[in-house]
Design a protein with these regions (language model features):
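Active-site-proximal alpha-helix that buttresses catalytic centers in soluble enzyme cores
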Residues: 1-248
């Protein structure tokens, strides 16, 4: 049996020249900026031009581009190895805002001609701005390509045991390393959202807080307090908080 696993992720620029178009793709998404199309494209162009120079400087500190695709490819190969007893399994990165983007990934999966397709967003917490946006784009492109194989979606796992164990292990190592400088405090920092998105029913903030609570429970009496905070605020709207900068 041939099984294709679509690994959905945000994507990231692979070099300095990709930063501005990546940002434009991001802010052009109606799930991100919820205004009419003509205005959204204008705002996306304006925001991406303004933010690109600073973003290039940040990416320059880590080699000029995002490590997200190489890391996702490593996950894909590891997943294939773990599942090889199930048959011919291939995992395909499906990036939302930079290559390989959804149309490219759909074509590659169609060429693989799978008997089944598993849709696996790599976002532990569900949001209309991430998981839903990726799956909507997938459905549109898959229908256009005529992908007829049965599909199953594995969606959101904010308190899945393996995920929490891995997160807690990383936090534990960080806390122990920080003790040399004093009493540590744990900041669970997640990407923020406009408050109106959450008030409209998006479960993201609730699931982020579930993740943090589960990790702290797994850590037990670690001798450090914690706070959940949010980062990457953009624009004039009120965002969920507390903001990471104010917490720091």
């Amino acid at each position: 049996m041939r099984i294709a696993i679509a690994l959905f992720n945000l994507g990231g620029p692979d070099g300095p020249d990709a930063v501005e178009p990546f940002l434009f793709n991001l802010f052009s998404d109606p799930a991100i900026i919820r205004v009419p199309g003509f205005l959204r494209r204008f705002l996306a162009r304006t925001i991406s031009r303004r933010r690109a120079p600073k973003a290039r400087g940040i990416y320059a500190r880590i080699g000029g581009g995002s490590p997200l695709l190489p890391n996702t490819l490593a996950q894909a190969r590891a997943l294939e190895e773990r599942l090889r007893d199930l048959g011919e399994v291939r995992a395909f990165p499906v990036m939302r805002y930079w290559h390989p983007m959804t149309p490219e990934a759909v074509r590659e999966i169609a060429q693989f001609a799978p008997d089944r397709i598993v849709l696996l967003p790599l976002y532990p917490q569900f949001s209309t701005t991430t998981t839903a946006s990726s799956l909507d784009a997938w459905r549109e492109e898959a229908a256009r390509a005529g992908l007829a194989a049965p599909m199953r979606t594995l969606c959101c796992y904010p308190v899945e045991a393996g995920f929490i164990e891995a997160l807690a292990a990383l936090v534990r190592d960080g806390v122990e390393a920080a003790r040399a400088k004093g009493r540590p405090r744990i900041l669970f920092s997640a990407h923020g959202l406009p408050e109106k998105v959450v008030k409209a029913g998006d479960p993201y903030q609730w699931q982020v807080e579930q993740t943090a609570a589960a990790a702290m429970q797994r850590l037990g009496d670690i001798g450090a307090d914690h706070v959940v905070c949010y980062q990457s605020r953009v624009g004039p709207l009120k965002w969920i908080g507390p903001d990471r900068k104010s917490v720091v």
